[in-house]
């Protein structure tokens, strides 16, 4: 349901849902009595935590930061497959402020219900409001975001589940491409990618998140799994192809691997825009998947070392040396502030 609303441009949560979330939040808060609350896109927590006067830390993405100007890219919608992108983008930029205000309305209504001040119907603030916002991104991707007492970079979160299976197949000869479109991606995209990669001599590892594929690979060097530990695969890969979302791009870039992001929604497009601007990847809109376009992008990423060099530079220089090295440092800081100011 979440991805349906996100991809179709509808508000992610309605007022009644957010009210229910606040009730659930408060029940847990009153039972557990936390000193600090840490949330990840749980929009109701910006209300619930304030109602109990508990410091709230939000883990979020810097491309939604109010410290940078938001130039909203046109997401993929039904009509964009047929409309000229330049014209559609021009028109979208002009109606986006009204659309964002509509998206912000449920949370603004929630805040008004509980006597909290308005966030100015600023969607960036509605998505990230907290006492401390921690950006789970590489600082180098967002040089225009200046950190301060209420906002800092915690660095990319590249989590993978523990895996006890055999990964020896990753050690074969030749370049390896890792394809994963995630739970929100369209598996039909994979069917377009595999023949191109096979023709270029790449070994291929595909994870489908349990979604069925309607084709059978021609070569034994193409292997398909429901799930694999992404970070482990990225360590052996020379290219990662995904939906452009930050969970997978963080895994790839932490391993110094360039990314081809086939992006659909605004979140993915904003993330990949920063990566492409840095030179560590290429973004293709999911409504512009011509075979020639895909092949050109893949060949560029595989043959032009500049993309790999930029990805490796990013992995080596995360720019976090002067900041608290762990989330616990930020939590302790918020706890201390509460302890001595309450």
Give a label for each model feature:
Residues 1-35, 89-90, 105-107, 222:
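Phosphate/nucleotide-donor binding subsite
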Residues 291-342:
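C-terminal amphipathic helix plus adjacent low-complexity
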Residues 36-41, 225-274:
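A donor-sugar binding/catalytic signature common to diverse glycosyltransferases
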Residues 35-36, 132, 176, 239:
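Structural motif
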Residues 57-143:
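Active-site-proximal region of nucleotide-activated glycan assembly enzymes
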Residues 37-51:
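An aromatic- and histidine-rich active-site surface loop
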Residues 140-239:
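Donor-nucleotide binding loops and adjacent catalytic segments primarily
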């Amino acid at each position: 349901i979440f991805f349906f609303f996100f991809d179709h441009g509808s508000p992610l949560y309605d007022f009644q849902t957010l009210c229910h979330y606040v009730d659930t939040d408060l029940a847990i808060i009153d039972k557990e009595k936390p000193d600090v609350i840490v949330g990840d896109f749980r929009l109701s927590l910006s209300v619930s935590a304030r109602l109990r006067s508990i410091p709230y830390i939000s883990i979020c993405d810097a491309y939604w930061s109010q410290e940078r100007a938001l130039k909203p890219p046109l997401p993929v919608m039904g009509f964009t497959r047929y409309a000229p992108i330049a014209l559609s983008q021009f028109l979208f930029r002009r109606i986006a402020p009204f659309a964002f205000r509509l998206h912000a309305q449920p949370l603004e209504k929630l805040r008004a219900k509980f006597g909290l001040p308005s966030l100015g119907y600023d969607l960036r603030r509605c998505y990230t409001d907290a006492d401390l916002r921690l950006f789970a991104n590489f600082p180098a991707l967002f040089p225009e975001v200046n950190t301060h007492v209420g906002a800092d970079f915690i660095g990319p979160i590249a989590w993978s589940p523990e895996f006890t299976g055999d990964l020896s197949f990753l050690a074969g000869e030749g370049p390896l491409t890792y394809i994963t479109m995630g739970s929100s991606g369209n598996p039909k995209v994979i069917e377009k990618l595999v023949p191109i990669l096979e023709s270029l001599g790449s070994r291929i590892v595909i994870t489908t998140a349990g979604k069925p594929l309607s084709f059978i690979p021609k070569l034994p060097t193409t292997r398909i799994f429901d799930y694999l530990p992404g970070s482990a695969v990225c360590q052996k890969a020379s290219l990662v192809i995904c939906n452009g979302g930050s969970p997978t791009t963080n895994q790839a870039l932490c391993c110094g691997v360039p990314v081809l992001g086939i992006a659909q929604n605004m979140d993915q497009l904003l993330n990949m825009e920063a990566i492409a601007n840095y030179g560590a990847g290429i973004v293709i809109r999911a409504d512009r998947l011509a075979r020639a376009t895909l092949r050109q992008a893949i060949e560029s990423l595989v043959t032009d070392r500049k993309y790999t060099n930029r990805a490796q530079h990013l992995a080596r220089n995360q720019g976090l040396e002067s900041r608290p090295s762990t989330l616990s440092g930020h939590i302790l800081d918020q706890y201390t502030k509460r302890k001595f100011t309450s």
